[in-house]
C-alpha cells in the first residue's frame, strides 16, 4: 500500500517520531531533532554525490507473445555512414526538443525512456517545439506505464510503449496530470484521450547495438540528413555497476561520469542521447579504447553528472556480455500526427477494469442483426489490474475515447453505422460489475465535428459477460427535434424507459416503428428513434 500523508503529532519527549509520507517515506515530527536531521541529510547528499546511486532492482520482464509480436514488426536499420562526415561529438539532450531529466517512479524505466524521452523528443523534433516550454509538449510516461503494468509496480519493455503510441496515441503531461506510484491512475475525460490520439508512432526501428557507425549516424542526423538526430533506447542491468563520477579524461561534451563496469542484476532501460569520440576508457586488461555514448538516465539530475554518464562503445562491441547485462539491440521511432475520422465517446462505471476491452466496427448496409467484425483498441485492452476504472483507491467512473476510424469511408452517408463492443472477460482475481452510462459517436468527416448520441440502447446499460453491443446511426440523429406530450405510462416501465419497440401510425396511414431512450433524470426529455 502507498503511504498516506498524515498530520504531524506533537511530542513531549526527545524521541523523533516518524510518520509515513507518500513522497519521502517519513515526516519529521519532533521539532528539536529537525536541525540535526537536516545536517545529516545534507552530509548524506554530499556523500551520495561522490558515489554510485542505486535504486531498487527490478527483475527482467517476461517476453510475452505480445512483445514477440511487436518485435516481429520492428524495422531493422543499417545505414552506410561512409558518405557522411560525422562530428567528434553529438549531444541531443542539449537541444530544445529534449525534456528535463526525469526522476522515474517505481519500475517505469522503460516508459520513462521510450515515452518520456524518445517519443517526447521525436514529436517535438517533428513539430519544432520546445519540450521545456510547456507540459503540453511533453508526454506522460505514466500514461503508458499504467496501461501496461497490470496495475502493479513492475517493469516492461520500451517497445510496448512505442506500440501503444502507434496503435492508440499518447497523452501529454498536461492532460495526464499527477499520479501517485501506487494509484496506477488512468486519466478521465474524452477531450484528453482525443488529444492523445493525435500523437502517433509511425514505425518502430531496431538497431544492432554493435553497429556503432549506424548508431552514431542516427544520433547525428536520424540517418536521413535531418538537421538534428534521433535518440535511442536500450536496456542493461543496473544494480552493482561501477560508474566513475570523477572522470577527468578527454571529452568534447564535458561530462564527468563514466561507466567502467557493467552491473550484474536489476533490469533497467535508459536513453542514448549522443556520443563523444574523445572519451577514453581502459578495459579490464588495461587496453585503452576511445569513444562513448552519452546516456541519460531517469533517476533525476542528482544522479551521475546531471543525470548523464558516458557508456564506452567497447561494452557493445566486446561480445562477452549477455543480453541481460547489456542489450544487443536498441530501438528508436519515427513519429507522425494523426486525425481520426470518427471517435466513440464513452462514459463507463466499473470496478475491475482489466475485465474490459473495447472494439469498434463500421458498416454502410444498415445491417444491425448480424455480428460485425470488431477491431479492438490497443488501450484499455484487459489492462490496468483489478482496480476501479481510474485506478487503485480512485473512482469507478471514467470517460474515455475510442478511435472508430477503421474502415470508415471518407464521406458520410445515410447508411453509415458505427458499432461499439464493450467486452467483459473474467481476468484477474476479481470479476467486476458495472454499467455503460453514456455512448455517443463524434464524426470528424465534415467541416465541423458532429456528435451523435446512441439511441439504439437504453442507458445506463449493465455490462454483461461477453459483448455488450451498441450502435450509432448518424441518420437517426439528423431528424428535427420536436417537443411532444405523452403520458409517461406509455413509455416508462418501473421508473425506466421501456426497451420495447412501439408501433405508430402516421398521418398518411403508414405504420412506423418507434423506440425510446436516454430519458433525462427529471423525466422532461428523452430520445425518440423511429424507422
Model-inferred region functions:
Residues 51-92, 343, 446, 461-465, ...:
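N-terminal zymogen propeptides
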Residues 73-170:
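Substrate-binding/charge-relay-adjacent region of secreted/lumenal peptidase catalytic domains
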Residues 484-531:
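Surface-exposed, beta-sheet-biased, low-hydrophobicity segments with strongly acidic/polar composition
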Amino acid at each position: 500500500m502507498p503511504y498516506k500523508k498524515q498530520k504531524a503529532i506533537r511530542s513531549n519527549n526527545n524521541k523523533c517520531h516518524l510518520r509515513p509520507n507518500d513522497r519521502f517515506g517519513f515526516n519529521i515530527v519532533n521539532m528539536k531533532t529537525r536541525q540535526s536531521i537536516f545536517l545529516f541529510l545534507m552530509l548524506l547528499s554530499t556523500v551520495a554525490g561522490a558515489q554510485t546511486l542505486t535504486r531498487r532492482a527490478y527483475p527482467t520482464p517476461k517476453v510475452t507473445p505480445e512483445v514477440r509480436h511487436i518485435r516481429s514488426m520492428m524495422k531493422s536499420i543499417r545505414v552506410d555512414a561512409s558518405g557522411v562526415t560525422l562530428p567528434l561529438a553529438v549531444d541531443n539532450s542539449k537541444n530544445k526538443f529534449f525534456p528535463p531529466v526525469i526522476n522515474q517512479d517505481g519500475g517505469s524505466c522503460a516508459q520513462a525512456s521510450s515515452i518520456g524521452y524518445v517519443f517526447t523528443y521525436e514529436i517535438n523534433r517533428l513539430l519544432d517545439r520546445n519540450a521545456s516550454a510547456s507540459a503540453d509538449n511533453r508526454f506522460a510516461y505514466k500514461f503508458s506505464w499504467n496501461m501496461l503494468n497490470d496495475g502493479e509496480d513492475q517493469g516492461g519493455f520500451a517497445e510496448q510503449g512505442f506500440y501503444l503510441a502507434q496503435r492508440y496515441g499518447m497523452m501529454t503531461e498536461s492532460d495526464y496530470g499527477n499520479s501517485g506510484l501506487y494509484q496506477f491512475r488512468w486519466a478521465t475525460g474524452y477531450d484528453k484521450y482525443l488529444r492523445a490520439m493525435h500523437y502517433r508512432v509511425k514505425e518502430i526501428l531496431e538497431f544492432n547495438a554493435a553497429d556503432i557507425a549506424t548508431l552514431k549516424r542516427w544520433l547525428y542526423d536520424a540517418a536521413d540528413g535531418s538537421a538534428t538526430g534521433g535518440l535511442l533506447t536500450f536496456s542493461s542491468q543496473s544494480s552493482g555497476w561501477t560508474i566513475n563520477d570523477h572522470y577527468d579524461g578527454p571529452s568534447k561534451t564535458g561530462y564527468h561520469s563514466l561507466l567502467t563496469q557493467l552491473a550484474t542484476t536489476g533490469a533497467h532501460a535508459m536513453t542514448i542521447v549522443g556520443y563523444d569520440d574523445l572519451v577514453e576508457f581502459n578495459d579490464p586488461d588495461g587496453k585503452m579504447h576511445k569513444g562513448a555514448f552519452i546516456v541519460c538516465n531517469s533517476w533525476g539530475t542528482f544522479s551521475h553528472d546531471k543525470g548523464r554518464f558516458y557508456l564506452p562503445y567497447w561494452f557493445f562491441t566486446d561480445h562477452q556480455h549477455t543480453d541481460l547485462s547489456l542489450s544487443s539491440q536498441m530501438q528508436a521511432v519515427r513519429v507522425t500526427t494523426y486525425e481520426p475520422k470518427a471517435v466513440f465517446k464513452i462514459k463507463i462505471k466499473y470496478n475491475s477494469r482489466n475485465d474490459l476491452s473495447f472494439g469498434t466496427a463500421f458498416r454502410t448496409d444498415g445491417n444491425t442483426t448480424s455480428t460485425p467484425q470488431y477491431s479492438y483498441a490497443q488501450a484499455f485492452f484487459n489492462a490496468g489490474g483489478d482496480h476501479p476504472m481510474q485506478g487503485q483507491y480512485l473512482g469507478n467512473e471514467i470517460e474515455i475515447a475510442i478511435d472508430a476510424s477503421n474502415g470508415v469511408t471518407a464521406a458520410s452517408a445515410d447508411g453509415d453505422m458505427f458499432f461499439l463492443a464493450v467486452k467483459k472477460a473474467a481476468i484477474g482475481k476479481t470479476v467486476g460489475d458495472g454499467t455503460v452510462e453514456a455512448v455517443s459517436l463524434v464524426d470528424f468527416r465534415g467541416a465541423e465535428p458532429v456528435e451523435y448520441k446512441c439511441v439504439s440502447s437504453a442507458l445506463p446499460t449493465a455490462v454483461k459477460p461477453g459483448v455488450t453491443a451498441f450502435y450509432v446511426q448518424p441518420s437517426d440523429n439528423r431528424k428535427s427535434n420536436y417537443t411532444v406530450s405523452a403520458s409517461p405510462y406509455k413509455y416508462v416501465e418501473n421508473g425506466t424507459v421501456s426497451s420495447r419497440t412501439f408501433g405508430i401510425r402516421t398521418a398518411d396511414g403508414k405504420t412506423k416503428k418507434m423506440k425510446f431512450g436516454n430519458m433525462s433524470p427529471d423525466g422532461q426529455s428523452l430520445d425518440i428513434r423511429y424507422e
